[in-house]
């Protein structure tokens, strides 16, 4: 799991660049009005991770930075006068609440920022009032109209106006220590900023036949566009799809529920757009680029740039393109801003005063100012483009971390410390529906931010929020109040994304909670005051934290009576909301004991012996079959030779007839094969002896008939081979059941069954199976053997109380070996050290007490290694 980066946008400025046929590339607007140079930014690194003001607050929402920070002034309703001074803000201009640059950045960057700009602009030949403007620049650079970020304005205009190949692509330009990130938007070839969605007309068959070129009819000409304008008026022009869910685009408190961008504003936009496009199909402006200037650390460069582009730059550019397609919003506002700047420059007005006029006059400039103040403070920006369309932007932040802060890897103090897997993306069964939703704001405050209950959607969402409690899972709440589970998950994901809630395991008095090691105790004084106002009759915050700092115990041990349970659970929810406490969770791995390993080893040895014996038996049968085939071949050769060579001698023919006349076919078969061997063993002979005339064929056809064989080496006859199960020809020493008594006794001393003792547990050491789902073949056999040993678990484990009372911990809880064996495969999925045992019950739809009893039983047998952490 990657270490989550602390929230730090590293945003220093926002620039708006347009390109038109009449004016060419122009730097229309930049915010803040006074920006330090790139060289000054390179030497002024801000430890953004050490900030304490990052919260769920947002610019324009009117919410405070934290629940207990009563001293922090709330944001003004006026979007122009927003953005309070914070200790962790970036080096950029303050919102126009004053006439000077941000005091903190002025003291940090010093006068060398403006001295660099002064030296650049002193030689400007176009400055008619050089001496006067030079004196003004020495006063603070408030009259420097031709320099932005230490660069000449005309140079920036050319650099930030890319070609059309960058249309809808990320524009990234690094200069010195800063990077320009933008999403250029270009006009279409047909002069439109957005493709029209024509409504198909029903044509008669005659019109279809008159159409000679079908492809030509698919092209929208100017005449067709004007004719279809009337038909397009009832059709609502929908914006390009945003990532935010429908109905939630603007965020809270900005008409997100009562009005949406797909309603009436689309109709008005269609009128304005159709009028403009009908008059001039080629608009003057053909490109605009909103550029965000960043100065990220070198090791965080890729991630910071990607976060800014994906979440803010690209989405903001798409929103502006949508407004431009409706009624040329960007170009009209750009011409207004350029006109105001030109007049102020001619009258020698300061930048701050001019920017104040521009922001109060132009909605586009105001939206850029709000965007900068919110994103640079790591808050949510609520942007009002006009009276009919508004939306919200933010860089999502991590709501928790599994790691403790170190000197080399610092974390934001107060961040929720947990390894809870309720939001694991790679989990097969996510915990969303089984998790509880902890609201980070009061219920009524959150509902008020929704803008009231003026519509059905707002009323429904207000009903959902009022019924959300941190002690019940989303699944239980949906069942109790007859709410769709999909709707509950949808609302939960939305609240979590916009920093209004957090997914946690349902709070329970049976769980254990400890003081978080990542708690920010610098906020303790203000937290004590807020806690006392909320819980005046209950123990103080220091006392509660002191109780939870001792030996970990279930939270129910701190509740004095049943009547205090609800109040103490509210205290626990308040502490979880502020990151003061975290849940102590239980994780386990399977421990394989030496006894289990010895049993598995004995089984594997026995299986190996059986396997070898089976292989030997198959090899023996194969050899016997080959011997039989060889003997049958010898017999055929003998008969064939006897019939051809001796047929000319009547005496031999008669003798052969007499010898075989009283025998059956099978007896003749046996006697013919055995006769050469009997002759060879009965008396000594030599090659060419007359007494062996009848066996010459056998001698020449087989080498076996000329060698005297002992009784132990003599092969069996084919008749005996047919009864192989009764008397095998050559029993293997590895055979389990030797049929020959004499040989069986002879080889029994060398048999492994007699000499190899069974494996002893002393020969093995215990080990841990770290991932049962990815276990090896040997580990799988160990796990299977553990499951088989559950049969006698009730007889082996003694329990002091065979029938413990309901709710008592320990003992068997009535768990039988059969139940354990059936539940063993289910429990194994959670014994990998990553899934908490507390999550098994909701995930597998099991009773919590039964799960605890099973784990206690397995733990008593020594088959678990248990650890507890957050």
From Swiss-Prot:
It holds the Pfam family NPR3. Residues 273-283, 691-716 have a biased composition (Polar residues). The keyword Magnesium does not apply. Keywords: Meiosis, Signal. GO terms for biological process: cellular response to amino acid starvation; meiotic cell cycle; negative regulation of TORC1 signaling; positive regulation of autophagy. It comes from the Eukaryota. InterPro entries: HTH_NPRL3, Npr3. Mediates inactivation of the TORC1 complex in response to amino acid starvation. Required for meiotic nuclear division. Belongs to the NPR3 family. This is Nitrogen permease regulator 3. It comes from Phaeosphaeria nodorum (strain SN15 / ATCC MYA-4574 / FGSC 10173).
